[in-house]
From Swiss-Prot:
Record region (Disordered): 83-410
UniProt short sequence motif Nuclear localization signal 2, positions renumbered to this chain: 52-59
Biological-process GO terms, alphabetical: flower development; regulation of photoperiodism, flowering; RNA processing
Name of the protein described by the UniProt record: Protein EARLY FLOWERING 5
Motif Nuclear localization signal 1 positions after renumbering to this chain: 16-23
UniProt KW keywords: Flowering, Nucleus
Its job: Involved in the regulation of flowering time in both long and short days.
Motif Nuclear localization signal 3 in this chain: 71-78
Coiled-coil annotated spans: none
Disruption phenotype: Early flowering in both long and short days associated with reduced levels of FLC.
Transmembrane segments: none
Compositional bias per record (Polar residues), positions renumbered to this chain: 267-281, 300-312, 326-343
InterPro entries according to UniProt: WW_dom-bd_prot_11
Amino acid sequence: MKTTKGGKVMNPTDAYRKQIRKREIKRNKKERQKVREVGILKKDPEQIKDQIRKLDMSKAEGALDKARKHKKRQLEDTLKMVVKKRKEYDEKKKEQGEATTSVMFSHLPPQRRLTGEEDLKPEDSVYYHPTLNPTGAPPPGKPPMYNSSIGLAISSDGASSSSAALSSITESEDSVLVNPPPLPPLPDGDNALSASLPLPPLPPLPPTTGLTLPHSPFPPPPPGPPPKEQDFVRPPLPPPPQLPQSSQPPPPGLSGSQGDGRFPESSDFTFDNRMNANITSVPLLPPPGIPSNESESRPAESNASSFQNANLSKMVAPPPPAPLHQQHQSTFAGAAASLTNFQPDVHPPPGMLRFPPPPPPLDMHPPHPGMFVGHLIPRPPYGPPPGPPPMMRPPLPPGPPPSSFQDGQAMIRPYVPNKPSFVKSAAPTVVRRPLAQHTPELTSMVPASVRVRRESATVTKPKPKTSIASSLSFTPRAMASAATVKVEPAKTSAASKPQSIDDSYTAFLEDMKALGALDG
């Protein structure tokens, strides 16, 4: 237990605080002492010697007073302390094995040599190197250090060996860095080759898919289901009004004998030959009214021609281009088999092509929808390609494009001529002149006392009678002033309403006339 100076027991908290305060004071004392030492070490002994030399010169002249003597004594003591502290600092650094180049000496100029010969030898510098630093210049922020003055064990050989080691390391690093440059083009070339390899197979992929799609359902379907599937697929679509007529079987006039001389021979027979080779799937599409294969091929050709005429006139909702190319590259049997798979997605219902109905040939009736659908897809080259050309319209007249509503209403409402574009708003062409009281040309000669604001411009008042003024016009000038004084009350009594600016101006003129101002 700690006690105070009076012998009282201290509070443990106060005792602890007092102990901490003692430690802090001791630490601050050491820090201040270090700061003093650093300040002494930073002082340049050469400057102190110059100041002492100046004081000695003034002493020789006999101008050294008591204050200067005291200053000289302080400078001598400071110089001794600086030399002593520097020696202690150098010895301490040597014992610790550290270089004496510290930040505290960075502000000092280079130390003077006792002889000029040592200044001419850069080999004595610690930073000397025969190739990297032949002049022995110190790095920025550090003072020049020499082996002769400080007595360091570091020699130029050691520095050169260390620098040689550093140079060898840098050379090895350069050699390591030189090897990688040829490596980057190799992976780039590999990537280019690997990127270019998958590109060539991409173009042949569509024909392979086009060939595989029709051949995948190559086995013929059963005789009964295909028409039923068509029936099941078509009811969800909106049936056109002519669908019952198209569902009827064609008349017996359509036969192979009638169709022999109707169409010239062409490349369609290639499709017919393929159809005969794969006849298992073809006779299932038409109804039992169609007799033979030849009769099937002929109406198919006529069907293709009707489809061509329909495309030339107007085509509505053409099939997508991708399935058409695939079907054109495939065989007829594969096309007939793939028709059952792509019919709900590719081919429109039989009535859609007839909206609006295309003009059929003169000597041919509309065939069965099943027969028409079977030969529509494998023969697209005979019609125009799908796209904007079949949907072209005649050039529109100049002006805004007519809408469907305007086209419908154009036949109902009568024609109303448009208003001429030159008609503008009926603005007045006559510029209104300003009032007389607002024009300076008219009111420049009127005195300010007479310029009374017109309260109501619309109110017009009759002019007062001027009989009295005319009767007084021939009176002597001595009596004119009295007459004018009498006229004013007469006017005010006669006119109960306020006078206008015109009345006041006429009264002013009459007064001037009565005074003789207007006499010639």
